[in-house]
């Protein structure tokens, strides 16, 4: 008979070094795994906040069979400008166009979380948000920023963990980690419900 640990091991369903750095703040042992999920398939009938939750859950679910005795964390981020979904730009021209649209506007970012306990077959989900108020950006500022950071794989066309902060006038929300894609305050709540002691 084997003795199981009181809590399953933790899997972060993301290869992002930024999300990993955030999770390390909680002083937990974990490993990263790439989810099997195509983000290009976006249900247009859902609101941006619901897409973030659904994608987070699907990312975690995609790792269920690979990690049958674990706590799997899935996360996803969406953004909305005037109610319209913003996607990852993918290239320079689209990034410039996206930031130009955001100039002087407010954009709400939603970070969905899913925590699957594959030992107990339970799933917990939540979403957190941040509203970013962009400064009035000149074409020169936008092009210079895009050239420096090349944020082509980032929702909103900026990297808040880098020079992207220079584009903002202010940020509203309860957890600054949400903009990087892993809302730690909400995650701590989910992990505590699984019996983990933090701190």
From Swiss-Prot:
The entry's keywords: Cytoplasm, Hydrolase, Nucleotide metabolism
Active site, UniProt feature: 76
EC numbers, comma separated: 3.6.1.-
Predominant subcellular localization, coarse grouping: cytoplasm
Site annotation Important for substrate specificity: residues: 18, 77, 161
Pfam annotation, one family: Maf
GO annotations of cellular component type: cytoplasm
Gene Ontology BP terms: nucleotide metabolic process
Cofactor(s) the protein requires to work: a divalent metal cation
One MF annotation (Gene Ontology) recorded for this entry: nucleoside triphosphate diphosphatase activity
Cytoplasm keyword on record: yes
Catalytic activity: N(7)-methyl-GTP + H2O = N(7)-methyl-GMP + diphosphate + H(+)
Compartment(s) of residence: Cytoplasm
Functional description taken from the UniProt entry: Nucleoside triphosphate pyrophosphatase that hydrolyzes 7-methyl-GTP (m(7)GTP). May have a dual role in cell division arrest and in preventing the incorporation of modified nucleotides into cellular nucleic acids.
Entry similarity comment: Belongs to the Maf family. YceF subfamily.
Protein name: 7-methyl-GTP pyrophosphatase
Species, as recorded: Hahella chejuensis (strain KCTC 2396)
């Amino acid at each position: 008979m084997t003795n199981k640990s009181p809590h399953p091991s933790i899997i972060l369903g993301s290869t992002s070094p930024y999300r990993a750095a955030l999770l390390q703040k909680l002083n937990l042992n974990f490993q990263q795994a790439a989810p099997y999920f195509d983000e290009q398939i976006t249900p247009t009938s859902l609101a941006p906040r619901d897409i973030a939750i659904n994608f987070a859950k699907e990312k975690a679910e995609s790792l269920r069979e690979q990690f049958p005795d674990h706590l799997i964390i899935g996360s996803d981020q969406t953004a909305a400008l005037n109610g319209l979904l913003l996607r990852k730009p993918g290239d320079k021209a689209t990034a410039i166009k996206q930031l130009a649209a955001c100039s002087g506007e407010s954009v709400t970012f939603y970070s969905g979380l899913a925590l699957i306990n594959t030992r107990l077959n339970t799933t917990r989900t939540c979403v957190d948000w941040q509203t970013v108020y962009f400064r009035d950006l000149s074409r020169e500022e936008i092009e210079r920023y895009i050239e420096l950071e090349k944020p082509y794989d980032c929702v909103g066309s900026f990297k808040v963990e880098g020079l992207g902060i220079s584009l903002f006038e202010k940020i509203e929300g309860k957890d600054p980690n949400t903009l990087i894609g892993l809302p730690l305050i909400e995650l701590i709540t989910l992990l505590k419900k699984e019996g983990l002691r933090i701190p």
